[in-house]
Swiss-Prot record:
Binding positions for heme per the UniProt entry: C482
Gene source species: Drosophila melanogaster
EC number: 1.14.-.-
Residue ranges the record marks as coiled coil: none
GO function term, MF aspect, one: oxidoreductase activity, acting on paired donors, with incorporation or reduction of molecular oxygen
Essential cofactor(s): heme
Gene giving rise to this polypeptide: Cyp12a5
High-level lineage: Eukaryota, Metazoa, Ecdysozoa, Arthropoda, Hexapoda
Subcellular location: Mitochondrion membrane
Key words, A-Z: Heme, Iron, Membrane, Metal-binding, Mitochondrion, Monooxygenase, Oxidoreductase, Transit peptide
Family: Belongs to the cytochrome P450 family.
Top-level EC class: oxidoreductase
Protein name: Probable cytochrome P450 12a5, mitochondrial
Amino acid sequence: MLKGRIALNILQSQKPIVFSASQQRWQTNVPTAEIRNDPEWLQAKPFEEIPKANILSLFAKSALPGGKYKNLEMMEMIDALRQDYGNIIFLPGMMGRDGLVMTHNPKDFEVVFRNEGVWPFRPGSDILRYHRTVYRKDFFDGVQGIIPSQGKSWGDFRSIVNPVLMQPKNVRLYFKKMSQVNQEFVELIKEIRDASTQEVPGNFLETINRWTLESVSVVALDKQLGLLRESGKNSEATKLFKYLDEFFLHSADLEMKPSLWRYFKTPLLKKMLRTMDSVQEVTLKYVDEAIERLEKEAKEGVVRPEHEQSVLEKLLKVDKKVATVMAMDMLMAGVDTTSSTFTALLLCLAKNPEKQARLREEVMKVLPNKDSEFTEASMKNVPYLRACIKESQRVYPLVIGNARGLTRDSVISGYRVPAGTIVSMIPINSLYSEEYFPKPTEFLPERWLRNASDSAGKCPANDLKTKNPFVFLPFGFGPRMCVGKRIVEMELELGTARLIRNFNVEFNHSTKNAFRSALINLPNIPLKFKFTDVPN
């Protein structure tokens, strides 16, 4: 036991020699001499009184045979910690990670977000940060991208890409291209479903991932990859699909599980670095293809007005490296996340046929025929579609929580928490709580409709909405809100509308433990959806 304690103390105190999350401390706009002496601060309890998990006990429960937390999924472990310590707990740092305060109190979420500063620090993505700031600094120096960067470098990059990615008019350019992708998705479903049962294979998640990568590539690379067609199965695109799958799989292991990669280069770290190199290599090839295409068009006298230029074209006008890194970030962050969200929506609609029927009524007005094209005007009139997407994100949230580094001293759950502390916000219990969402176990898109006419008199929508907006933030909040929000919303809206217009969707299997916790919540069951053709 003594040897174990000594080893644990060494592991806790030794500075990582490969990489540490604290090697790149966030820059803040906090006055260094700020001292709070207001009544709220003075009346709050000291930081030291926050319930604290003992590191030795935590290690034993998590890693040793018979430990209470051993083999638990992330959400199960968080629930167990909540039962043991309450709604706020301090978790000590370990194996190169910083300690953090974890809170389940939605009132704290607002405090944290209101005090995140102009350059919010979001912990995580350490492996990607290591790849870009250390291992491949020669390429990424000065342009680290949206996902791993912090401080001023993040702010500078975000200020470049925000006007391009967050403008609704720029997203609308992709209606026709997305429509083509979705038509191919529909045809592929018809090909792979069983002729007698109309069910797709249990590995349907791979098909969904192909659809999401195809969709995001239309924006990120200004190109359809052909992943939904027979001709695209042995292409460069297939390699990219494989590399991104490996990236997400290994990220979960290196970021979430106890690992020594921060102390020495483990075999998994080396494999991950090769994977990220491969993603970079393939992305560069596609960006170079786009540059050649644009140069050829310029020689031929093709000139597009500003409002018709693609996202990639606009970013290339700024800087090739900026365009390449942003494309990589969109690919790395835009596949599994959208796939999980889309899966959750399909499960909710399949298990609630009356909601699906109402959604189809709305979609039929937008798409009178199965092959009708989407228009900007028609897609403004789909409130129930947007409500279904939003409610599915509440029922099956994509992430367990969010985290920020405090930029000023703050009172969290009645305790004085100093600036520089990482606070992890866990809303998932509140999403299922009657206190915040009446009838929380029911899938009720009506709760998100803005007025009584939208809810068709079937449900007092205002009575079902949460009174605390910080409980439910599927795309984050503030300056660090998801930069791809509008793109993801477009993918989900167009893809869902096309499927519901073509198919009645059923899921005649259990949805128990439908998702498992990794970096995000991932589908955990065979997705044997039944797709029955809708009559014309």
